Amino acid sequence: MGTRLLGCAALCLLAADSFHAKVTQTPGHLVKGKGQKTKMDCTPEKGHTFVYWYQQNQNKEFMLLISFQNEQVLQETEMHKKRFSSQCPKNAPCSLAILSSEPGDTALYLCASSQ
């Protein structure tokens, strides 16, 4: 049963660095069990003030979860408000956390930045 729970919510992350971008996302891959907290970090390109977190689900659909300008939230989905936590402090990596993982969280999570 423990193995089944462990494989319940596999979270894949794409390190943008592999595309020669200046955005760094860690960790590169996560596997979490149901109910576990999950945290991902994103270091935007130097000088960029906008940060975006996206989720690409198993149907290959992209959805913006949250966006920041500097430390302020610009857009936030209802799903993010209910199940996620994010922050983007000055001079530190931005983070995206899933408060309690569920099987439906199996997805590719992407961070992007712009000026």
UniProtKB/Swiss-Prot annotation:
This protein's record includes keyword Electron transport: no
Annotated keywords: Adaptive immunity, Cell membrane, Disulfide bond, Immunity, Immunoglobulin domain, Membrane, Receptor, Signal, T cell receptor
UniProt signal peptide: 1-21
Principal subcellular localisation of the protein: membrane
Task performed by this protein: Probable non-functional open reading frame (ORF) of V region of the variable domain of T cell receptor (TR) beta chain. Non-functional ORF generally cannot participate in the synthesis of a productive T cell receptor (TR) chain due to altered V-(D)-J or switch recombination and/or splicing site (at mRNA level) and/or conserved amino acid change (protein level). Alpha-beta T cell receptors are antigen specific receptors which are essential to the immune response and are present on the cell surface of T lymphocytes.
InterPro entries with a match to the protein in the record: Ig-like_dom, Ig-like_dom_sf, Ig-like_fold, Ig_V-set, TCR_beta_variable
Assembly, per entry: Alpha-beta TR is a heterodimer composed of an alpha and beta chain; disulfide-linked. The alpha-beta TR is associated with the transmembrane signaling CD3 coreceptor proteins to form the TR-CD3 (TcR or TCR). The assembly of alpha-beta TR heterodimers with CD3 occurs in the endoplasmic reticulum where a single alpha-beta TR heterodimer associates with one CD3D-CD3E heterodimer, one CD3G-CD3E heterodimer and one CD247 homodimer forming a stable octameric structure. CD3D-CD3E and CD3G-CD3E heterodimers preferentially associate with TR alpha and TR beta chains, respectively.
Name used for this protein in its record: Probable non-functional T cell receptor beta variable 23-1
GO cellular component: plasma membrane; T cell receptor complex
Database matches in PROSITE patterns: IG_LIKE
Domain (Ig-like): residue spans on this chain: 22-115
